[in-house]
UniProtKB/Swiss-Prot annotation:
Family: Belongs to the transferase hexapeptide repeat family. LpxD subfamily.
Purpose of the protein: Catalyzes the N-acylation of UDP-3-O-acylglucosamine using 3-hydroxyacyl-ACP as the acyl donor. Is involved in the biosynthesis of lipid A, a phosphorylated glycolipid that anchors the lipopolysaccharide to the outer membrane of the cell.
Gene: lpxD2
Ranges for region Disordered: 345-373
Gene Ontology molecular function, alphabetical: N-acyltransferase activity; structural constituent of carboxysome shell
Coiled coil (UniProt feature): none
Pathway: Bacterial outer membrane biogenesis; LPS lipid A biosynthesis
Reactions catalysed, as given in the entry: a UDP-3-O-[(3R)-3-hydroxyacyl]-alpha-D-glucosamine + a (3R)-hydroxyacyl-[ACP] = a UDP-2-N,3-O-bis[(3R)-3-hydroxyacyl]-alpha-D-glucosamine + holo-[ACP] + H(+)
Record protein name field: UDP-3-O-acylglucosamine N-acyltransferase 2
Organismal lineage: Bacteria, Bacillati, Cyanobacteriota, Cyanophyceae, Gloeobacterales
PROSITE patterns the record matches: HEXAPEP_TRANSFERASES (PS00101)
Gene Ontology cellular component annotations, sorted alphabetically: carboxysome; membrane
């Protein structure tokens, strides 16, 4: 495809030879001749100068010298433009055609137009698959599930009873939507009694669920993932939780039960959220942050412990074990300082001139009286 054609399709300003042939998309360091690459972070500008790519997508205000070595496509949002460029060259694998002969579809299930169901998938009683739904092979859709238009369920997924999935959703391989929440009551003999998880899960429109992610059903009521939210692989959503619109949860994030996450929140990898907490809109939590209390909107949280060399870590660990004793020592020093400061406070209140406190000097290893002032 000619670079000029790509420029027109992406709405970019072309700078340089538009007749260059582009055969694919690649990163700055991996690109070869014929590839289109991109730059969204200015700190990689030096690498762009030495790339083997035939052209690059860059920010609209990118400063290039007159002798810049390759043609440029300028755009205000180069990363989003890069995402659109991939679509010009990527051909997804073909979806199942119609209903595979080995699929099991209950007689009470309702399938809309252009529904595709792959081999060995099971569609339960009363399931409703709207127009354009695709269910890849080896999926199990329990009774009473409703899946909205143009949503895709990839292979080896399980969607449990009465779950509702909206339009244009994507559920990646191995995800489980609507498994029982983790709810037990302790009995008199010390054993655990399983609490029936009678609620459900609702995925609103344009939600994406990553591979092997689990979203548990509520004990009562619902667990809800709101429109436009994206959950990475291996994310765990506890029962009764709610995730707001356009929120990103990265790999291995865990929400304990009844957590409420606001809109446009970003939780980085391995962030943990304790149960029954509220996280406000636009909060960002960095990698491995432990959120143990509710967070107001528009906060940035740093709660991780960075890795360090073993020598430094062992020294820090030794100090950590001494903290209780150190705290006691600090408290004792604070009390002594308060005693020393008391005469100053008293003199100040009475209007008398401050005088230094009399402090007894205890001399060790000597005989005789202390020096007299």
């Amino acid at each position: 495809m000619k670079l000029s054609d790509i420029s027109a399709k992406l709405g970019c300003a072309l700078e340089g030879d538009g007749q260059v042939d582009i055969v694919g998309i690649a990163g700055i360091e991996e690109a070869e001749a014929g590839h289109l690459t991109f730059l969204s972070n200015p700190k990689y500008k030096a690498k762009l100068r030495h790339t083997k790519a035939s052209a690059a997508i860059v920010p609209a205000d990118f400063e290039a010298s007159a002798a810049w070595p390759l043609p440029l496509l300028r755009h205000a949002n180069p990363y989003l433009t890069f995402a659109h460029a991939i679509e010009l060259f990527y051909s997804p694998p073909p979806a199942p055609h119609g209903v595979h002969p080995t699929a099991v579809v209950a007689p009470t299930a309702v399938c809309g137009h252009n529904v595709r169901i792959g081999a060995s998938s099971v569609i339960g009683e009363g399931v409703v698959l709207a127009d354009g739904v695709t269910v890849y092979p080896n999926c199990t859709i329990y009774p009473g599930v409703r899946i909205g238009r143009n949503s895709t369920i990839h292979s080896n997924c399980v969607v449990r009873e009465h779950v509702v999935i909206g339009e244009d959703c994507i559920v990646q391989n191995g995800a489980v939507i609507g498994a029982d929440g983790f709810g037990y009551a302790k009995q008199a003999d010390g054993t655990w009694y399983k609490i029936v998880q009678s609620g459900s899960v609702v995925l609103e429109n344009r939600v994406e669920i990553g591979a092997c992610t689990t979203v548990d059903r509520a004990t009562i009521g619902e667990t809800r993932i709101k429109s436009g939210s994206k959950l990475d692989n291996l994310v765990m959503i506890g029962h009764g939780s709610s995730v707001g619109e356009n929120t990103l949860l990265c790999g291995q994030v865990g929400l304990a039960g009844s957590s409420t996450v606001g809109r446009n929140v970003m939780l980085a990898g391995q962030v943990g959220v304790a149960g029954h907490l509220h996280i406000g809109d636009n909060v960002v939590a960095t990698v491995k942050s432990c959120i143990w209390k509710s967070v107001e909107a528009n906060q940035v949280l740093y709660g991780n412990i960075p890795a360090s060399d073993s020598h430094t870590w062992l020294k820090a660990s030794a100090v950590f074990r001494q903290l209780p004793h150190m705290q006691k020592s600090v408290q004792q020093m604070q009390k002594r300082i308060a005693v020393l400061e008391e005469p100053f406070k008293t003199n100040g209140k009475s209007g008398q001139a401050d005088a230094p406190p009399k402090v007894a000097l205890e001399c060790h290893g000597t005989t005789g009286d202390a020096p007299q002032g």
